[in-house]
Amino acid sequence: NNSKAKCGDLAGWSKLTFKSADECTKTGQKS
């Protein structure tokens, strides 16, 4: 659950890291 929150935060405060956010979401789902 923490991972999901972090992913959301990343996409929220950094649109530039949208790619990173997408990867984070994928990783979170895999985990």
From Swiss-Prot:
Domain comment, as recorded: Circular dichroism reveals that this peptide presents mainly random coils as its main secondary structure.
Chain's role: Cytolysin that shows weak hemolysis and weak myonecrosis.
Keyword Ribonucleoprotein annotated: no
GO cellular component entries: extracellular region; membrane; nematocyst; other organism cell membrane
Main location: secreted
Protein's organism: Olindias sambaquiensis (Hydromedusa)
Protein name as annotated: Cytolysin Oshem 2
Gene Ontology biological-process entries: killing of cells of another organism
Cellular location(s): Secreted; Nematocyst; Target cell membrane
Keyword tags: Cytolysis, Membrane, Nematocyst, Secreted, Target cell membrane, Target membrane
